[in-house]
Swiss-Prot record:
Pathway: Purine metabolism; IMP biosynthesis via de novo pathway; 5-amino-1-(5-phospho-D-ribosyl)imidazole-4-carboxamide from 5-amino-1-(5-phospho-D-ribosyl)imidazole-4-carboxylate: step 1/2. Its EC number is 6.3.2.6. GO terms for biological process: 'de novo' IMP biosynthetic process; cobalamin biosynthetic process. This is Phosphoribosylaminoimidazole-succinocarboxamide synthase. Belongs to the SAICAR synthetase family. Keywords: ATP-binding, Ligase, Nucleotide-binding, Purine biosynthesis. It catalyses: 5-amino-1-(5-phospho-D-ribosyl)imidazole-4-carboxylate + L-aspartate + ATP = (2S)-2-[5-amino-1-(5-phospho-beta-D-ribosyl)imidazole-4-carboxamido]succinate + ADP + phosphate + 2 H(+). GO terms for molecular function: ATP binding; phosphoribosylaminoimidazolesuccinocarboxamide synthase activity.
Length: 236
């Protein structure tokens, strides 16, 4: 299949298809940290992320969450609706970890009384700064109603996935979401949901996400394979 490249990102390439409203997503083996400043190629990582994200998005579609996901094509490719992405990273935290622990001096691993949502302006040149609702309004990134909907959907997604992951012995520590508008102007969930953009800990406290790479804790693909195997077993 010969498709024109639309966009090449850190972890995925996006290609046109014969349908203007559908894009082909190809997952890469590249893994990055420090907002892309450090990069490595890890064989099999793209395939694992594609399969995990496809499985999770299919689940979300089935429980009524509107997403861009259409279907998985191969181990590394999937079809998605074409979406105009809002330049916001929506982070939900269930447990203190990573930058949250550093910013607020909270011990990593402390469960939060209630899930906390944070917003980041998706802008590589500015290093994706932490912003609030007023900043979003000033920058005209989204309306108050759209932000309210995004937060509502993020909490709904969290409630479902937290329980689902817990059923296979994984704690959903935190995750990042992105939203955008489809051709009808409907605000839907986009991007991916994989161990690249969430934190997962097993019942022994072992990291099962990209922190394995960031902190040099062992085999990244082995951790991702474990996540995929557990989710697949539950989905059968």
């Amino acid at each position: 299949m010969s498709n024109q490249l639309i966009y090449s990102g850190k972890a995925k390439d996006i290609y046109e298809t014969a349908d203007d409203e559908i894009v082909l997503i190809s997952y890469k083996d590249q893994v990055t940290m420090l907002n892309g400043a450090h990069k490595e190629m890890i064989e099999g990582k793209g395939s694992l992320n594609n399969q995990i994200s496809a499985l999770i998005f299919d689940r979300l579609n089935r429980v009524g969450v509107s997403t861009h996901f259409i279907k998985q094509l191969s181990e590394t490719e999937q079809l998605n609706k074409r979406v105009a992405i809002i330049p916001l990273e929506v982070v939900l935290r269930n447990v203190a970890a990573g930058s949250f622990s550093k910013r607020f001096g909270v011990k990593e691993g402390q469960a939060l009384d209630e899930p906390i949502i944070e917003l980041y302006y998706k802008n590589d040149a500015l290093d994706d700064p932490f912003i609030n609702d007023e900043h979003v309004s000033f920058l005209k990134l989204a309306t108050d109603e759209q932000i309210a909907y995004i937060k509502q959907e993020t909490h709904r997604i969290n409630a479902y996935l937290k329980e689902w992951f817990a059923s296979v012995g994984l704690t959903l520590v935190d995750f990042k979401l992105e939203f955008g508008f489809d051709k009808e102007g409907m605000l839907i969930l986009a991007d991916e949901f994989s161990p690249d953009n969430c934190r997962l800990w097993d019942n022994a406290g072992r990291h099962m996400d990209k922190d394995v790479f960031r902190r040099q804790l062992g085999s990244l693909t082995q951790a991702y394979e474990t996540v995929l195997e557990r989710l697949r077993a539950l989905d059968q």
